[in-house]
Amino acid sequence: MRILRGSPALSEFRVNKLLELCREQDLPVTGIYAEFMHFADLTSELDAEALEKLEKLLTYGPTIEEHEPQGLLLLVTPRPGTISPWSSKATDIAQNCGLNAVKRLERGTAYYVESSSELSSVQIDIVKSIIHDRMMEAVFGDLEAAAALFSVAQPAPMTQVDILSGGRLALEEANVSLGLALAEDEIDYLVENFTKLGRNPNDIELMMFAQANSEHCRHKIFNADWTIDGVEQPKSLFKMIKNTFETTPDHVLSAYKDNAAVMTGSKVGRFFPDPETRQYNYHHEDAHILMKVETHNHPTAISPWPGASTGSGGEIRDEGATGIGGKPKAGLVGFTTSNLRIPGFEQPWETDFGKPGRIVNALDIMLEGPLGGAAFNNEFGRPNLLGYFRTYEEKVTSHAGEEVRGYHKPIMIAGGMGNIRDEHVQKKEIPVGASLIVLGGPAMNIGLGGGAASSMASGQSAEDLDFASVQRENPEMERRCQEVIDRCWQLGDNNPIAFIHDVGAGGISNALPELVNDGERGGKFQLRDVPNDEPGMSPLEIWCNESQERYVLAVAPENMAAFDAICKRERAPYAVVGVATEERHLTLEDAHFDNTPIDMPMDILLGKPPKMHREATTLKVDSPAMTRDGIELNEAVDRVLRLPTVAEKTFLITIGDRTVTGLVARDQMVGPWQVPVANCAVTAASYDTYHGEAMSMGERTPVALLDFGASARLAVGESLTNIAATDIGDIKRIKLSANWMSPAGHPGEDAGLYEAVKAVGEELCPALGLTIPVGKDSMSMKTKWNENGEEKEVTSPLSLIITAFARVEDVRKTITPQLRTDKGETSLVLVDLGNGKNRLGATALAQVYKQLGDKPADVDNAEQLKGFFDAMQALVRQDKLLAYHDKGDGGLLVTLAEMAFAGHCGVNANIAALGDDVLAALFNEELGAVVQVKNDELDSVLSTLAANGLEACSHVIGAIDASDNFVIRSGDVVVLERSRTDLRVIWAETTHKMQALRDNPACADQEFEAKKDNSDPGLNVSLSYEVNEDIAAPYIAKGAKPKMAILREQGVNSHVEMAAAFDRAGFEATDIHMSDILTGQAVLDEYHGLVACGGFSYGDVLGAGEGWAKSVLFNAQAREQFQAFFNRENTFSLGVCNGCQMLSNLKELIPGADLWPRFVRNESERFEARFSLVEVQKSDSVFFDGMAGSRMPIAVSHGEGRVEVRDAQHLAAIEASGTVAVRFVDNLGNPTQQYPNNPNGSPNAITGLTTKDGRVTIMMPHPERVFRTVANSWAPEGWGENGAWMRMFQNARKNLA
């Protein structure tokens, strides 16, 4: 083993945070320094040249000064016996660089802890707990001890459970020791069947059975027979959900049987490379819509980052594994937790009810979990466009007196939509003899028993079992697998995939039997053919672990060669682990121990284990009405704006890429001031169309504490009032996902669940014409623990989260909440679907005063709700609405405030028509919406509303002005008069506090201060050219298409939109993978232009873009090709984002690039996804010809974009050379260091450079993601199809005239 030092691992503010944690624990720690340590496992000693190469490879990140660390050494490494995602990617790079003696690289962090007095062993243990994650890491006292990382354990054997002599008792004991969560009747079933087989079951067979038949996988409660209050019920819960499909099957192509549901989409030109020529072009066909929403609650409670991350990853795999291959497109993430209690910012309603030690508190879940979910989506390359966040934790009246209701077991929801070809919607037959394949990463000893663990209330299983059941993520591996799936579906009728499933709960022990069972086959499997990174695992651990980023597929023998070639090109590992058999029998052979760990008929595993019967009793609680004592209106406004459910969510949004794909038409951030208040998410179906897809969410979970049915109806209703803001047409085009969370078995909750499912499945959805073709349930939403001898529990309310998906006719018609001050005289109209009832039960107002109230909002009239949707659709289509915002949490007050924030304007409202009770009028959460309309169209709008049955509930409630005043009157009385800016700042406090705790606090403070500036003019545009002129048109007309190499490396994810931009400018865009160059399948000589695209090459493990660059620099043949290309004078090159970082590291090969800087971690130390204003500088770049002085917004999405120069002289030399091409500017047009206008902290606001001759340009922002006007989060009126950044690509074409 060789040890190589790396760069410092912690910035100053990260060190300060650790010191603060030490102080809180009364530790005498005075200083902490940390640096990365690299460990190389070698097959032979390295010669001097190879050692130098390895040292260069492991030099990445910010440049460091020499430093000799002092203090107690604590070395944190991945857990011995595991291989971290960092290791597998870094080892890949080393081998691609020709370092064949490097068997494996691994990285640890060496912490040096200084203290005023010697630390005791107890104190050292506390420090260890602060600096490492016990789930995935170990701590050593010296560097040499890291050799344990490379030790190889001997395989452990399987064990048997002796039921032949020990009977049922033996199985009962195994049920506890293995954490199987088997029900009594399942134990009987297994004893009976193995006795019939005349043999004892192996541990692996029992674990496989437990996973496959867990509540998590089998949905026993949803399939159960029910008796309520002594009356047998005619339908199961699942049957009532299916009723929505039976009554409205319209537009549904696949429901209830696959990994995601499918509905009809639009006919568009899908843009992808031809499988033979690899040239990108449009393929005119149906792009049907995939939809799926998952929950990952249990893992997120135990370990939030990996829990949320693998939640998003699993849902992405569900979409890819639909039919015989789908394409994930846009994501959503949502969280419900108990109260945050932010230190120093605790709110009056946030009582501390305690929690068990093994789960994480709500604050830490929300500091870590969202980062995990965002990081997976970012690295995979899926924009995250939607979400919600609710906190609830309160002592409420119950049938037993009082009980605490809340979300100690959080809800972590991950969902999304994608597209699929018409001919791929249904799975094919699995031929006998088909290869059964595991595609993706290796098996590791993690995530054991996740399905069974998720099926228990938090706190019921032993702590080490809880920790065993969380997984870890490697999104770059999943991206490679998806690229394989993409290549397969792009072959059309020649798609080699016959059948595909993702690997989720239960690992391959669930996925492989499910694969062959669904294909009506059996399977013969070889355990030792499963790719395995931990040789010491027992057969049970190899078969049942939940290592992520894996799919199982069936491929016919004659298609294996084509499949193998695709996997090799994409560098996606796979293994044939079995063969499909005619006989429906499952056999697993173990060549190492020469035995057969599994040998059982399929019907014992997946046959008909006993069906559950639920007996339930209805319990209704009389909750007292809200008392108004002590509620003062101004204070109520402030409290509600600070409630996390209502408050600004920027800290959850800017961490997630919202522009990747170049198809995003509506993200969360709205208007020139980029305020996060969008009603729904919208994507374009392709680059040649305005058809698209939309998704929205609805949930009103606290209402279930008063009325189960109302809570469910409101969730459906809110998803509709959110999605009504875009152009859908017929309501039957909308399909819903229903995610049900319940503390099953808790008194009254089972009957409540039945009531809620019936309310939507049998009543509301059929009445509206809505279908629920997909969903999921999580039935153990309760946390129990013992505190000082006292039994405690926190029980979640019944929680239905609805996600609505729809085909969109014209994405340009989507309306946002941004109030418009540039449209003449206008009015605000409230459509109140509560019809003046103004019920306050379970509202934000009740919550912030620690109350629940008695009567909640409800959907009293389904016909009126449908009339509302139809009216809004007519108005959206006729362009009659200037702004639209649904009414939800916080009521009318919050709706108006958010509209004013987005429009940066004043509101003057009068609520006299809404009744005398001001609090109830402003804070009720009845469904509805506020729209802004031009006064000269007001009558026409009101008559459309009246024609749809809404006349009595539509009220003109006021107007707007270009001031900072937020005024609400009731008749002549002013009831509220506030500064809009002051309200905006209160609304932002929660996001500021969370950002300051999680990211660089200096950056969080700057962003918060900027929100106080009422004079901020917002984003604006000033162009030196005519945006709607196509200067490439004359060259395109001649028919010659210069060849453009669209270059990608494993983990790159922005290549398709880049190809689309160059294609539109008249280039022949060709898909080139680095593996094509390294294997000689592609040569750069043939191309005029080269673009290195954005993403996360190798998951950014050796510095962003640095691993990719070094695989060129250290490979003689690749180096020669690139050098020759850059030196050819008739070529040009572009590097964007990851490609910018990569080309900056190739500067020794690029003439005139010698002054280029490096790009390192953002000053905020966070991935930044922003829509930032930049100015094009005067330079010789061929891309920016005629654009100097132009100022316009652009997509920014990166974690390592800060320019790093050697010193002041280097910076001065760059400025003097005339090679600065693009700078960040503030909204007044001045280059800025202020965050977030300068999102990465680059000196002199530099974010793009060129070479001295202008042939090679690099930039961190993404012009290719906003080349269409519709893909800009905000654009001025008057831009046509092409956005301002299309000019760059047209310039490149003109340059080759």
UniProtKB/Swiss-Prot annotation:
It holds the Pfam family GATase_5. It is an enzyme of class 6 (ligase). One of its GO terms (biological process) is 'de novo' IMP biosynthetic process. ATP binds at G307, A308, S309, T310, G311, S312, G313, G314, E315, I316, R317, D318, A678. The active site is at C1137 (nucleophile), H1262, E1264. Keywords: ATP-binding, Cytoplasm, Glutamine amidotransferase, Ligase, Magnesium, Metal-binding, Nucleotide-binding, Purine biosynthesis. Mg(2+) binds at E718, N722, D886. Its main location: cytoplasm. InterPro entries: Class_I_gatase-like, FGAR-AT_N, FGAR-AT_PurM_N-like, PurL_large, PurL_linker, PurM-like_C_dom, PurM-like_C_sf, PurM-like_N_sf. It is found in: Cytoplasm. PROSITE patterns: GATASE_TYPE_1 (PS51273). It comes from the Bacteria. Its EC number is 6.3.5.3. Residues 1044-1297 form the Glutamine amidotransferase type-1 domain. In the N-terminal section; belongs to the FGAMS family. Monomer. This is Phosphoribosylformylglycinamidine synthase. It comes from Vibrio vulnificus (strain YJ016).
